Curated annotation (Swiss-Prot):
A GO term for molecular function: acetyl-CoA C-acyltransferase activity
Known function: Catalyzes the final step of fatty acid oxidation in which acetyl-CoA is released and the CoA ester of a fatty acid two carbons shorter is formed.
Record GO cellular component, one term: cytosol
Protein name as annotated: 3-ketoacyl-CoA thiolase
E.C. code: 2.3.1.16
Pathway noted in the entry: Lipid metabolism; fatty acid beta-oxidation
Quaternary context: Heterotetramer of two alpha chains (FadJ) and two beta chains (FadI).
Originating organism: Shewanella baltica (strain OS185)
Length: 436
């Protein structure tokens, strides 16, 4: 059996990425304060359809994701269909795979095209860290259920008497792993210590990311892939990411205190991604359908792979497990790639993965390979800056990476690009894109 992955339909047509778009990414409680993930999702899909001059009625499937779920709209994909002029019969469902969510939505739509069930679909994701589902304590939740069954005033009073003041306090969404109690930042700190990644190296990577992102915006390269977002009450707009440190100065990073290990830590707010609001989406078609409609695809999906590892140690090492799978399925080696784009959740996590890419010992002991994945050529790596600068709305990052890599490869005259990300739960993803 061949190891090669056939990302084509029954006619042998490739899966085309016709267009991609995102909102600007904004730090928590800034430009998108009060704007839900659903509203941002509708905003970007509407604009993507308008810019592409694609009739919404032609969309056969929409798969969309959200990590921080809103109880009022649990199926964000269906609500986007109803809010963007598509047929009410359009197939729509929601997915979640932590920070790899919109990679998952893209793969789901691609596989629907591969099987011949559809020819045109939209994939993406959105998250808001400003509009959050604030919960209640377990004791209060239990009491509220009991209140529904209470008949008399006395019964209701007895239920309330079981509650203390602390039981009435709101409960924000969890930031830790359910199974371990560890946060992403604590895991990044563990990886920094395990792999001897210095504070100086983390700060240097963050500085590089912000500098390149600032230069990329100044060059105008992102104007066609980032929309102008007008937000209620429509007296202002946001047209660029607001986390990027313009005129970044490396020395200033050293001033920040460690965020997760106050005494001996090296992970800080400056070398980590901030809580971010934003949305992104891509249009996928069969190659033949794209040609028939007159579209020039920005890229094609060549291969993809997901991985899962233990959550107690090195939980954010997903790229080092998923990448060799995607490369093998594409019949490629790391050195064959034109560009390499790795999601920078934390500088420590990124540097640890880069270290493992180059490690023969890791390849032999963890991957069952007789050679390392490969040393990363920094002239190919995150050439426009990364998530440390742009920010990270959890479900939106995947399709941001896909669009950004395809468009940058197009500017360079074509080639192949790797997009890869870690995700909560010990998950990882890698996707190889090709551009003509």
């Amino acid at each position: 059996m061949s190891d090669r992955q056939q990302v084509t339909n029954a006619k042998g047509e490739r899966i085309a990425i016709v267009a991609g778009l995102r909102t600007p990414f904004a730090k928590q409680a800034t430009a998108f304060h009060g704007v839900s993930a659903l509203d941002m999702g509708k905003m970007v899909v509407n604009e993507l359809l308008a810019r592409s001059e694609l009739d919404p009625k032609l969309i056969e499937q929409l798969v969309y994701g959200q990590v921080v779920q809103m109880p009022a709209a649990p199926n964000i994909a269906r609500e986007i269909v109803l809010g963007t002029g598509m047929n009410v019969s359009t197939d729509a469902y929601s997915v979640t795979r932590a920070c790899a969510t919109s990679f998952q939505s893209a793969v789901n739509v691609a596989e629907s095209i591969m099987t011949g069930n559809i020819e045109i679909g939209i994939a993406g994701g959105a998250d808001s860290s400003s509009v959050l589902p604030i919960g209640v304590s377990k004791k209060l939740a239990h009491a509220l259920v009991d209140l529904n069954k209470a008949r008399s005033f006395g019964q209701k009073l007895q239920i309330f008497r079981r509650l203390g003041i602390k039981d009435l306090l709101p409960v924000p969404p969890a930031v830790a792993e359910y199974s371990t109690g560890l946060s992403m930042g604590q895991t990044a700190e563990q990886m920094a210590k395990t792999y001897n990644i210095s504070r100086a190296d983390q700060d240097a990577l963050a500085h590089r990311s912000h500098t390149l992102a600032s230069e990329t915006w100044a060059s105008g390269h992102l104007r066609d892939e980032v929309m102008v977002a007008h937000v209620p009450p429509y007296k202002q707009f946001i047209d660029r990411d607001n986390n990027i440190r313009e005129n970044s100065v490396l020395e200033s990073y050293a001033k920040l205190r460690p965020a997760f290990d106050k005494q001996h830590g090296t992970v800080t707010a400056a070398n980590s991604t901030p809580l971010t609001d934003g949305a992104s989406a891509i249009i996928l078609m069969s190659e033949g359908r794209a040609k028939a409609l007159g579209y020039q695809p920005i890229g094609y999906i060549k291969s993809y792979a997901f991985s899962a590892i233990d959550v107690w140690q090195d939980m954010l090492m997903g790229p080092s497990y998923a990448t060799p799978l995607a490369l093998k399925r594409a019949g490629m080696e790391l050195e064959d790639l034109t560009l390499i784009e790795m999601h920078e959740a934390f500088a420590a996590q990124t540097l640890a993965n880069m270290q493992m890419f180059a490690s023969k010992k890791f390849a032999e002991e963890k991957l069952g390979r007789n050679r390392a994945i490969g040393e990363i050529d920094m002239s190919k790596f995150n050439v426009l800056g990364g998530s440390l600068a742009y920010g990270h709305p959890f479900a939106a990052t995947g399709t941001r990476l896909i669009t950004q890599v395809c468009r940058e490869l197009k500017r360079r005259g074509g080639g192949t690009g790797l997009t890869t990300a870690c995700a909560a739960g010990g998950l990882g993803v890698a996707m190889i894109l090709e551009v003509e």
